């Protein structure tokens, strides 16, 4: 199973989305917004794109794909690691939704640039838990750097916290809104670093 993991490359990225599945606009033509595209590089440097509307999500998708293509031109052997199929299925769905970057996303998928670590872990490890959630595996490799002191610790909680950000913005509580977004960013960064360390 471990032979499925490509050789490391300086261009490798470790990627994670945060999303709100209940977000919609107007008449509800579309549902679900991936509001945070987050990644770390092989050195653990975090970067992110935010999207708080469908228009911003489209822009974030275009910017992310442009970034990946430029990085791949510099690092042809790079891969983008993620855990479970959410990231790749949502990138493809976004590209189809907006009619942008479809060929580019398809090419990255066909070329095997994205590497889902979940099936590799399922085949390679036997753990004392029914769940192979990355959060259940983290005690094996994250050491003392745990999620317990973070404002956001679980995916479903991040959705609730994101909704509280929208409320804070609507009520004009800018300081609270900034703190809430930082908590979500910290959670996403931890997920990306966890994927890197895994």
Q: What is the predicted function of each stretch?
A:
Residues 1-26, 70:
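Long, highly charged low-complexity segments
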Residues 2-5, 56, 184:
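Helix-loop elements that line ligand-binding/catalytic pockets
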Residues 7-10, 31-35, 73-78, 143, ...:
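Short, well-ordered loop/turn elements at secondary-structure boundaries
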Residues 15-18, 40-42, 81-84, 187, ...:
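Generic beta-strand/beta-sheet core signal
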Residues 22-25, 91, 197:
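Short helix/loop capping segments that flank catalytic or ligand/cofactor-binding pockets
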Residues 30-44:
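Short conserved beta-strand segments at catalytic cores or DNA/RNA-binding microdomains
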Residues 41, 47-163:
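Conserved DEDDh/DEDDy metal-dependent 3′-5′ exonuclease domain
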Residues 154-157, 163-198:
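Mixed-charge, glycine-rich, non-catalytic linkers/tails in nucleic-acid processing enzymes
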């Amino acid at each position: 199973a471990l032979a499925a993991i490509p050789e490391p490359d300086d261009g490798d990225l470790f990627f994670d989305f945060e999303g709100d599945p209940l977000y919609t606009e107007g008449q509800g033509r579309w549902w679900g917004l991936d509001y945070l595209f987050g990644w770390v590089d092989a050195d653990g440097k975090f970067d992110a794109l935010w999207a708080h509307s469908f228009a911003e999500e489209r822009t974030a998708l275009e910017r992310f794909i442009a970034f990946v293509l430029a990085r791949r031109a510099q690092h042809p052997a790079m891969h983008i690691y993620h855990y479970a199929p959410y990231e790749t299925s949502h990138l493809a769905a976004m590209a189809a939704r907006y009619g942008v970057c479809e060929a580019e996303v398809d090419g990255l998928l066909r070329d095997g640039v994205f590497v889902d670590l979940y099936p590799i872990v399922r085949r390679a490890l036997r753990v004392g838990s029914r769940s192979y959630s990355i959060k259940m595996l983290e005690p094996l490799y994250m050491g003392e750097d745990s999620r317990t002191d973070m404002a956001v610790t679980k995916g479903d909680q991040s959705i609730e916290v994101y909704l509280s950000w929208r409320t804070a913005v609507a009520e004009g509580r800018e300081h609270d809104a900034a703190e809430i977004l930082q908590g979500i960013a910290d959670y996403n960064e931890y997920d990306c670093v966890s994927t890197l360390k895994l």
